[in-house]
């Protein structure tokens, strides 16, 4: 509601001002002569002073009332602006919520289409990294037929199935959209051969027995009790073998490790290398290269500070 144009206080103030004006005119036109005496002069001065004080008080009252009206109007306008701002915030929040819901529905719909559509299914499978392992072995372990929806394939589980092949060290399965499944494998490489009651076993650098077959040329024999990835003697022997320079490693016919502290190597020409423990292996390998240039049958590098030849 708008404020009334004239309040009761304003009317009283205006009436008082009008009365003062009339009194002033009466005094000016028909008042007593100032020369009538000093006895009448005192009351007139007091009346005039009182009128001036009343007028000043009325002016202050009017000014205060005006200020009050302006402050009230300003406050009312502020509340209106705040109400409008709150309304705009609610509208914007509702719009944002509707947009999020719409995008979520679109994403769900698109995901459902891609999940079930035959356009995003396996049409070809590409296998790379095979050598001894055949593509048929990989596809058989993969066990994902053509026509399978790509989004329905658990690639980690598929890679684990392929890696279960004994000769496979690692496998990776990737979906290449729109319709290709790619399988990448890394085959195990033999670094030693161990002979047991059931024949020869190929051992890789991690101590994994991955095949029962004759070793390829240049693969040394591993002489330990029972090779295994966590067997200490197997790990020690393979650590020494893989630390040798390639040209020297090719000359090794056998590496024996009855214990982790008594490792020996036998070369193709029958010479023996006493290695000892796996400590300071790099130094021992470096000293052995120079030591083998000297004639002898036994080369002892178990103490690399004092290598000997016999």
Swiss-Prot record:
Localization, UniProt: Cell membrane
Keyword Repeat: no
Domain POTRA: 120-188
BP terms from Gene Ontology: cell septum assembly; FtsZ-dependent cytokinesis
Main location: membrane
Membrane topology of this protein: Single-pass type II membrane protein
GO CC, any one term: plasma membrane
TM ranges: 96-116
Keywords for the protein's UniProt record, in alphabetical order: Cell cycle, Cell division, Cell membrane, Membrane, Transmembrane, Transmembrane helix
Entry keyword Cell division: yes
PROSITE patterns associated with the record: POTRA
UniProt xrefs under InterPro entries: Cell_div_FtsQ/DivIB_C (IPR005548), FtsQ (IPR026579), FtsQ_DivIB (IPR050487), POTRA (IPR034746), POTRA_FtsQ_type (IPR013685)
Spans within the Extracellular topological domain: 117-310
Cytoplasmic side: 1-95
Disordered, as annotated region: 1-57
Role summary: Essential cell division protein.
UniProt family annotation: Belongs to the FtsQ/DivIB family. FtsQ subfamily.
Name recorded for this polypeptide: Cell division protein FtsQ
Organism in which the protein naturally occurs: Mycobacteroides abscessus (strain ATCC 19977 / DSM 44196 / CCUG 20993 / CIP 104536 / JCM 13569 / NCTC 13031 / TMC 1543 / L948)
Gene: ftsQ
């Amino acid at each position: 509601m708008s404020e009334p144009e004239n309040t009761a206080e304003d009317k009283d103030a205006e009436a008082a001002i009008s009365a003062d004006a009339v009194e002033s005119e009466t005094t000016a036109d028909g008042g007593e002569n100032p020369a009538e005496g000093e006895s009448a002069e005192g009351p007139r001065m007091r009346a005039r002073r009182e009128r001036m004080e009343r007028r000043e008080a009325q002016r202050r009252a009017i000014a205060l009332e005006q200020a009050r009206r302006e402050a009230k109007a300003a406050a009312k306008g502020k509340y209106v602006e705040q109400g409008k701002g709150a309304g705009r915030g609610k509208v914007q929040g509702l719009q944002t919520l509707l947009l999020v819901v719409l995008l979520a529905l679109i994403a769900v719909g698109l995901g459902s289409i891609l999940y079930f559509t035959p356009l995003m299914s396996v049409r070809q499978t590409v296998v790379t990294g095979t050598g001894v392992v055949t593509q048929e072995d990989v596809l058989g372990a993969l066990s994902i037929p053509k026509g399978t929806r790509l989004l329905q394939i658990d690639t980690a589980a598929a890679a684990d199935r392929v890696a279960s092949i004994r000769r496979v060290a690692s496998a990776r399965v990737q979906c290449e959209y729109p319709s290709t499944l790619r399988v990448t494998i890394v085959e195990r490489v033999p670094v030693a051969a161990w002979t047991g009651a059931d024949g020869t076993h190929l051992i890789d650098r991690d101590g994994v027995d991955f095949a029962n077959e004759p070793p390829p040329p240049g693969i040394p024999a591993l002489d330990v009790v029972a090779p295994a990835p966590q067997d200490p003697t197997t790990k020690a022997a393979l650590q020494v073998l893989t630390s040798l320079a390639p040209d020297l490693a090719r000359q090794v016919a056998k590496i024996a490790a009855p214990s982790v502290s008594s490792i020996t190597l036998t070369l193709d020409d029958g010479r023996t290398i006493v290695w000892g423990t796996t400590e300071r292996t790099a130094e021992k390998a470096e000293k052995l290269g120079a030591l083998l240039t000297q004639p002898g049958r036994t080369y002892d590098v178990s103490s690399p500070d004092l290598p000997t030849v016999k």
